[in-house]
Amino acid sequence: MSKKAFQSQLSYSMKTEYPTYNQLRAGLNYSSPYLYEGGNPDLRPETRHELSLLSRYMKSSLMINYTAVVDQIIQVPTLYADNIMLYRPDNHGVNKYLSLSISQRVNWGDFWECALRMDYQTQWMRVAGFTRERGDGYMLKADNTISLSNHVQCFVNGAYRSASENGLFRIPRAWNLDVALNFSLLSDRLNIYLECADVFSTLHGKRTYDGEHITMDYSRNYQTRTFTIYVSYKLSNLISSKKYKGNTTNDEIKRL
C-alpha cells in the first residue's frame, strides 16, 4: 500500500449556536385548527462537539462522524388543548448522533461505471415525553453510468432507505429510481439531456411521532415524478476580424 493510495484525515470542531429571534419569541402563532407554534424566551445556547474521520484508498472511502450536542434546542410537539398541538422549542440535555458512510466505485471497462454507497446512522436522545431514546436506520444507493457509444450515455440511479429515526420522528422506509439520457451530437456542439426523476413516484413525505399524551401521523402524498429536458448548443465565433500584427516600430508607423 503506497502513501499516495491511502489518505486519512481526523478532525474535531466545537461551536456554539445561539437561538434565533423567532425561537425566542414569547407569543403563539396560529398555524392550523390543530397546530399552534410558539417560542421560548428562556432558551439557552447549544454547544455542538463534532469528531470526524475520513479515509480513502484508491476507489474506496470511509467516513465516520460522531456529534454530541449539549443543551440541544429541539422543537417538541406537546398537547396544548383538546385536539390542538403546540410546537415549542426547548433545551434538552446531551444528545448524541453517529453516522457511518462507505462508498466504492466499480468499473467494467469503459462501458459501465457504478458508484455504490451505504449510509448508517443512529442517535441517542433524551427528551421528556419522548418514547424512543435510541433509533437507527440505513440507506443503500447505486449510481450507474452506462456509455452506449462515444456520444450517448445512460444514467440509472436507485436508492433504498430503511425505516429510521430522525430526531423525534420515525420515518418509514422508501425507495426511488431515476433514469436519464445524455446525447452529444454535431461534433459535441449539440448536447441534449433527458431526465425522469423518481420514475415510480415513491418519495412521499411521511412521518410519525409518539409522545406524552400526543400521537401524530403525518402523510403528504403528491406527484413526485419530474421530467427535465436540457438542450445546449455551442455557437462558433460569428465575428471574425483581421488584426494588424506589427513586429517593429517601423511597422506601426507604416500602419498609421
Regions found by a protein language model. Give the residues of each.
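C-terminal beta-signal and adjacent terminal beta-strands/loops
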Residues: 185-256
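C-terminal beta-barrel architecture of Gram-negative outer-membrane proteins
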Residues: 122-125, 140-184, 190, 200, ...
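Outer-membrane beta-barrel translocator domains and adjoining extracellular loop/strand segments
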Residues: 21-29, 34-36, 67, 72-81, ...
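Repeated loop/turn-to-beta-strand initiation elements of outer-membrane beta-barrel proteins
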Residues: 5-8, 59-64, 109-116, 150-156, ...
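Transmembrane beta-strands of outer-membrane beta-barrel pores
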Residues: 12-18, 28, 57-59, 66-72, ...
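Residues on the lipid-exposed face of transmembrane beta-strands in outer-membrane beta-barrel proteins
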Residues: 1-3, 12, 51-57, 100-106, ...
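Outer-membrane beta-barrel signature, preferentially recognizing the C-terminal barrel domain
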Residues: 16-65, 69-70, 86-98, 220-225
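Gram-negative outer-membrane beta-barrel transporters
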Residues: 93-159
